[in-house]
Design a protein with these regions (language model features):
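N-terminal loops that bind phosphate or other acidic moieties
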Residues: 1-117
Length: 117
Protein backbone atom coordinates (compact mmCIF):
# COMPACT_ATOMS: atom_id res chain seq x y z
CA UNK A 1 0.00 0.00 0.00
CA UNK A 2 1.13 3.55 -0.73
CA UNK A 3 -0.05 6.52 1.30
CA UNK A 4 0.26 10.26 0.98
CA UNK A 5 0.29 12.11 4.30
CA UNK A 6 -0.81 15.71 3.75
CA UNK A 7 -1.82 17.45 6.98
CA UNK A 8 -2.18 21.18 7.61
CA UNK A 9 -0.59 22.67 10.73
CA UNK A 10 -2.31 22.67 14.11
CA UNK A 11 -2.18 26.36 15.03
CA UNK A 12 0.18 27.00 17.92
CA UNK A 13 0.89 23.29 18.35
CA UNK A 14 2.40 21.49 15.33
CA UNK A 15 3.72 22.54 11.95
CA UNK A 16 2.46 20.69 8.90
CA UNK A 17 5.69 18.67 8.75
CA UNK A 18 5.56 17.81 12.47
CA UNK A 19 1.97 16.61 12.11
CA UNK A 20 2.94 14.55 9.08
CA UNK A 21 5.85 12.94 10.92
CA UNK A 22 3.56 12.07 13.84
CA UNK A 23 1.10 10.40 11.45
CA UNK A 24 3.96 8.57 9.74
CA UNK A 25 4.89 6.94 13.05
CA UNK A 26 1.46 5.27 13.12
CA UNK A 27 1.77 4.09 9.51
CA UNK A 28 3.47 0.71 9.75
CA UNK A 29 2.60 -1.04 6.48
CA UNK A 30 3.67 -0.03 3.01
CA UNK A 31 5.20 3.21 1.79
CA UNK A 32 4.24 6.70 2.86
CA UNK A 33 5.32 10.15 1.77
CA UNK A 34 4.79 13.37 3.72
CA UNK A 35 3.79 16.46 1.77
CA UNK A 36 3.44 19.62 3.90
CA UNK A 37 0.31 21.60 3.03
CA UNK A 38 -1.20 24.90 4.07
CA UNK A 39 -4.52 26.67 3.71
CA UNK A 40 -2.61 29.91 3.17
CA UNK A 41 -2.45 30.86 6.84
CA UNK A 42 0.22 30.25 9.44
CA UNK A 43 3.18 28.37 7.98
CA UNK A 44 2.34 29.04 4.34
CA UNK A 45 5.52 30.97 3.54
CA UNK A 46 7.69 28.26 5.09
CA UNK A 47 6.03 25.47 3.11
CA UNK A 48 6.13 27.38 -0.18
CA UNK A 49 9.71 28.60 0.28
CA UNK A 50 10.98 25.12 1.13
CA UNK A 51 9.00 23.53 -1.73
CA UNK A 52 10.59 25.97 -4.18
CA UNK A 53 14.09 25.39 -2.78
CA UNK A 54 14.30 28.97 -1.54
CA UNK A 55 16.03 30.59 1.39
CA UNK A 56 14.84 32.69 4.30
CA UNK A 57 15.64 36.27 5.21
CA UNK A 58 14.97 38.07 8.49
CA UNK A 59 14.20 41.77 8.61
CA UNK A 60 13.42 44.30 11.31
CA UNK A 61 9.88 45.66 10.98
CA UNK A 62 7.02 46.71 13.25
CA UNK A 63 4.25 44.62 14.79
CA UNK A 64 0.57 45.65 14.52
CA UNK A 65 0.91 48.21 17.32
CA UNK A 66 4.26 49.65 16.27
CA UNK A 67 6.82 47.75 18.31
CA UNK A 68 10.02 46.76 16.50
CA UNK A 69 10.27 43.02 15.81
CA UNK A 70 12.21 40.63 13.60
CA UNK A 71 10.15 38.82 10.97
CA UNK A 72 11.11 36.18 8.44
CA UNK A 73 10.13 35.81 4.80
CA UNK A 74 11.15 33.52 1.99
CA UNK A 75 13.06 34.13 -1.22
CA UNK A 76 12.89 31.78 -4.19
CA UNK A 77 14.76 33.01 -7.25
CA UNK A 78 13.43 36.54 -7.73
CA UNK A 79 10.20 35.95 -5.79
CA UNK A 80 9.58 37.07 -2.21
CA UNK A 81 7.18 34.92 -0.20
CA UNK A 82 5.78 37.06 2.59
CA UNK A 83 3.29 35.83 5.15
CA UNK A 84 1.21 38.73 6.44
CA UNK A 85 1.02 37.14 9.88
CA UNK A 86 4.80 37.46 10.29
CA UNK A 87 4.49 41.21 10.84
CA UNK A 88 0.76 41.90 11.15
CA UNK A 89 -0.66 38.75 12.72
CA UNK A 90 -2.88 38.53 15.77
CA UNK A 91 -0.44 36.05 17.26
CA UNK A 92 2.00 38.91 17.85
CA UNK A 93 -0.38 40.58 20.28
CA UNK A 94 -1.60 39.82 23.77
CA UNK A 95 -5.34 39.52 24.25
CA UNK A 96 -5.53 42.96 25.88
CA UNK A 97 -3.78 44.51 22.84
CA UNK A 98 -6.36 43.35 20.28
CA UNK A 99 -7.90 46.57 18.95
CA UNK A 100 -8.54 46.92 15.21
CA UNK A 101 -8.77 50.70 15.54
CA UNK A 102 -5.15 50.89 16.72
CA UNK A 103 -3.59 48.04 14.74
CA UNK A 104 -1.78 48.44 11.44
CA UNK A 105 -0.28 46.28 8.70
CA UNK A 106 2.60 48.73 8.26
CA UNK A 107 5.10 46.01 9.21
CA UNK A 108 4.03 43.88 6.26
CA UNK A 109 4.81 46.82 3.99
CA UNK A 110 8.24 47.05 5.60
CA UNK A 111 8.86 43.39 4.72
CA UNK A 112 7.83 44.06 1.13
CA UNK A 113 10.20 47.04 0.98
CA UNK A 114 13.03 44.92 2.43
CA UNK A 115 12.43 42.27 -0.22
CA UNK A 116 12.62 44.87 -2.99
CA UNK A 117 16.07 46.08 -1.85
Amino acid sequence: MKALIAIDSFKGCLTSMEAGKAALEAFTEGEAEIIPVSDGGEGFSTILTESLGGTFRTAVCHDPIGRPIKARYGLADSTAIIETAAASGLGLLRKDELNPLKATSYGTGELILDALE
